[in-house]
Design a protein with these regions (language model features):
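Structured mid-to-C-terminal alpha-helical surface segments
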Residues: 1-43, 54-57, 69-258
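Glycine-rich beta-strand-to-loop/alpha-helix junction loops that act as flexible
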Residues: 46-49
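Active-site micro-motifs of SAM-dependent methyltransferase domains
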Residues: 51, 66
Length: 258
């Protein structure tokens, strides 16, 4: 269990508020327990939080996202047992929430070390497969011990999923994540992008359409979405960062098509 003093120290070190630190502690705690179990070899951690914790993206993230390659009945039996066990270790509870696809649960941490509740959405998708599975070690500043690997998609597959996320929901964090992945050597694989878009019946989308969608994203929306996810001292720089990131991505996609 993390202490109030540890939260305060880490918040000062990372230059974020204490809610961000406690939420990330809960994320890391959940992952450590999930991946200590055999069934987790078929549960792949993805999305913005995976990008932060596995690929070291600077921005923080709010939810936990997974692709599951288990039968739904087997998964539900496994996950509810995990929830029961976690509730014995920490003052947390889990409730299923409505979801248009897959399964969504809400992790709620009771007021304790913080004077208010903390919430994390846990999203599990069953309708797709992971094409490039990998496993990694998570190193953390939090008082959490990992004893096993974390399973996840490759950097390139995360990039393809981020393009899909941007095309289907258009959030500032997706623009940021695309830029970060490019700087880390991720490559634009249109075949993989189309495979990811197939689940939304968008596999016929063109590269030009993707570029125009990115070009049409507003600076205001980028700033509003990113403010809670970056250190306090970086928030005033988000407008300039958006201009740089937008040009960087456009130049990358333009060079790729030459």
């Amino acid at each position: 269990m993390i202490t109030e003093e540890q939260i305060h120290t880490l918040a000062k070190k990372k230059r974020v508020n204490e809610t961000v630190i406690f939420r990330e502690y809960l994320q890391v705690f959940f992952l450590s327990r999930l991946y200590s179990r055999r069934e987790s070899e078929n549960i792949f951690f993805k999305g913005g939080t995976a990008l932060h914790l596995i690929f070291n993206a600077p921005r923080f993230s709010e939810d936990l996202d997974f692709t599951v390659e288990l039968e739904e009945k087997e998964f539900l039996s496994f996950i509810w047992q995990l929830f029961r066990d976690l509730s014995k270790e920490e003052a947390v509870e889990f409730k299923e929430r409505k979801s248009l696809a897959g399964k969504r649960f809400l992790l709620t941490a009771a007021a304790g070390v913080l004077s208010y509740k903390t919430f994390i959405n846990l999203d599990f998708s069953f309708r797709e497969k992971i094409f490039e599975p990998q496993k990694s070690i998570i190193e953390t500043d939090y008082p959490v011990l990992f004893t096993s690997y974390v399973y996840h998609p490759s950097k390139g597959e995360v990039f393809a999923e981020k393009i899909r996320a941007f095309v289907t929901r258009s959030k500032g964090r997706d623009v940021y994540d695309l830029w970060y992945l490019i700087t880390q050597g991720a490559r634009f694989d249109m075949h993989l992008v189309k495979e990811k878009l197939r689940y939304y019946d968008l596999e016929n989308i063109s590269e030009d359409k993707i570029l125009k969608t990115i070009e049409g994203f507003s600076k205001k929306d980028f700033i509003l979405d990113m403010r809670p996810l970056v250190p306090i001292n970086e928030r005033d720089k988000l407008g300039d960062l958006f201009d740089y990131i937008s040009d960087y991505i456009k130049n990358y996609l333009s060079r790729k098509n030459q």
